[in-house]
Amino acid sequence: MTIDEIVEAIEKLTVSELAELVKKLEDKFGVTAAAPVAVAAAPVAGAAGAAQEEKTEFDVILKSFGQNKVQVIKVVREITGLGLKEAKDLVEKAGTPDAVIKSGVSKEEAEEIKKKLEEAGAEVELK
């Protein structure tokens, strides 16, 4: 029997026969129907979408220091108050998840930091 033939046979079943088929498949293979999981997951996705729309705190992440590493280090020191070695180490982490220049800042402050870093030649991402 081909898959198409199986689908045709399933299409001809009544609702009660489909319910019985699902029950037998669950018992036979030790699984449960996925529909309740999908229904439960839907509100979570909606909540995540709402949270993104209302985002008020941002992380400033250095993606690349570009051609002018020294200038980017100077700007990072100015923004963060780090020492020279710490700022250099942070700039050299560009492109990694650890390259967070500042976290939990307002949108305005994040945009200002991004502008300063981009003027120094860096590539920056706001999350």
Curated annotation (Swiss-Prot):
According to the UniProt record, one GO cellular component term is: cytosolic large ribosomal subunit
Q: Does the keyword Ribosomal protein apply?
A: yes
Q: By its UniProt entry, which InterPro entries does this protein fall under?
A: Ribosomal_bL12 (IPR000206), Ribosomal_bL12_C (IPR013823), Ribosomal_bL12_C/ClpS-like (IPR014719), Ribosomal_bL12_oligo (IPR008932), Ribosomal_bL12_oligo_N_sf (IPR036235)
> What GO terms are given for molecular function?
mRNA binding; structural constituent of ribosome
Which GO annotations describe the biological process of this protein? translation
Keywords, alphabetical: Ribonucleoprotein, Ribosomal protein
Gene3D superfamilies assigned: 3.30.1390.10, Single helix bin
State what this protein does: Forms part of the ribosomal stalk which helps the ribosome interact with GTP-bound translation factors. Is thus essential for accurate translation.
How does the annotation summarize its subunit structure? Homodimer. Part of the ribosomal stalk of the 50S ribosomal subunit. Forms a multimeric L10(L12)X complex, where L10 forms an elongated spine to which 2 to 4 L12 dimers bind in a sequential fashion. Binds GTP-bound translation factors.
Q: Which family does it belong to?
A: Belongs to the bacterial ribosomal protein bL12 family.
Protein name per its UniProtKB record? Large ribosomal subunit protein bL12
The organism is: Thermotoga neapolitana (strain ATCC 49049 / DSM 4359 / NBRC 107923 / NS-E)
